[in-house]
Amino acid sequence: MNFSMHLVLAVAAAACLCVVTAAPEGRLTRTKQQRPTRGFKNVEMMTARGFGKRDRPHTRAELYGLDNFWEMLEAAPEREGQESTDEKTLESIPLDWFVNEMLNNPDFARSVVRKFIDLNQDGMLSSEELLRNVA
């Protein structure tokens, strides 16, 4: 072998040594902060809701409670002509809830006034309507 061939082999060996010494030792370990988990975080979020068979049956719509008292009040004109055989009617409501709804829900307050105070349904409250004696 001539001198140029030895020189090429020596340069190649030196290049391999440089590459090997510059390479990381063993397997790369992460020293940085772990990457956050993507996607859904909990089991409840991993299931579809509101889509067909997976949707929970809504039994609350059948019960009359404080949550749907306003809907029951709005539907009262349609139910006046029907005989009520429904055992789920709401007999009384808490005063604190009623006051809170009157203050925070203008649609509810408007419905209560239309249903129970504005007797002639003219959109105006007369002194007779406001001061009538409810027995």
UniProtKB/Swiss-Prot annotation:
Gene Ontology biological process terms, A to Z: neuropeptide signaling pathway
Sites bearing Phenylalanine amide, chain numbering: 51
The name this protein goes by in its record: Allatotropins
InterPro entries (UniProt xref): EF_Hand_1_Ca_BS
GO cellular component, one term: extracellular region
Chief location of this protein within or outside the cell: secreted
The keyword Cytoplasm appears for this protein: no
Tissue note: Allatotropin: Expressed in corpora cardiaca (CC), corpora allata (CA), antennal lobe (AL) and gnathal ganglion (GNG) (protein level). Expression in AL detected in all animals, expression in GNG detected in most animals and expression in CA and CC detected in few animals (at protein level). Allatotropin-PP-1: Expressed in corpora cardiaca (CC), corpora allata (CA), antennal lobe (AL) and gnathal ganglion (GNG) (at protein level). Expression in AL detected in all animals and expression in GNG, CA and CC detected in some animals (at protein level).
Record's subcellular location: Secreted
Superkingdom, taxonomy of origin: Eukaryota
Protein source organism: Agrotis ipsilon (Black cutworm moth)
